[in-house]
A protein has these predicted regions:
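Short functional hotspots at interaction and active-site rims
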Residues: 1-188
């Protein structure tokens, strides 16, 4: 694993950040609440947090150096069939010839149809080294996204969709470039 990470780091300066497209998924639910709060001195910070039933969904997106692209929200978990449909219907129409699509090592990312769909658009596929979220700038984007969603405290899937749309609209090109720089894709 360490050798793969070293090889990845050595190759990073050679890649054009404008051509990199990082894809990942993250879980969202209707019980998301802020993890920290503030209150006046000597007063307890109190907030309500839902317990019991909640609804879960999965958000898939691509991160480019200038924006979050191809957002997709699905109720429940992602499997190979869902991921393949996402690629065919949402991501591939946005890919440009010469793009480099970077995926983590999730088993649903490694099926033959994934590579076939991406290469058919003139793009190439690269897989991150195992256990390397620090090399994936979309992880930083998801952290910012989830902070917004916790603050919004959406308690229904419809409210969650609205909060997600608001959060995605708040991402500026400078934010995306910062995520790339933090992960050392610095030709921006």
């Amino acid at each position: 694993v360490q050798a793969a990470r070293v090889l990845w780091r050595q190759a990073q300066p050679q890649w054009d950040s404008q051509r990199l497209v990082f894809i990942d998924e993250t879980g969202l639910n209707t019980k998301m609440a802020r993890l920290y709060g503030r209150s006046p001195t000597h007063q307890r910070c109190v907030a309500s947090v839902p317990h019991g039933h909640w609804q879960s969904s999965t958000f898939i997106a691509a991160l480019r150096a200038e924006s979050i692209a191809a957002p997709f929200l699905i109720k429940g978990a992602v499997n190979a069939e869902v991921f393949t449909a996402y690629l065919a219907q949402v991501l591939c129409p946005e890919l440009r010839r010469g793009d480099v699509v970077v995926l983590d090592n999730l088993s649903t990312h490694k099926i033959a149809s994934v590579t076939a769909l991406i290469t058919a658009r003139g793009a190439t596929v690269r897989y991150l080294p195992p256990y390397s979220p620090d090399l994936n700038p979309i992880e930083l984007a998801f952290a910012k996204l989830k902070a917004h969603l916790r603050q919004a405290a959406a308690r229904t899937l419809l409210d969650l969709q609205g909060a997600l749309a608001d959060s995605l609209a708040s991402f500026q090109p400078a934010h995306c470039q910062g995520f790339f720089r933090h992960a050392r894709y610095a030709s921006i």
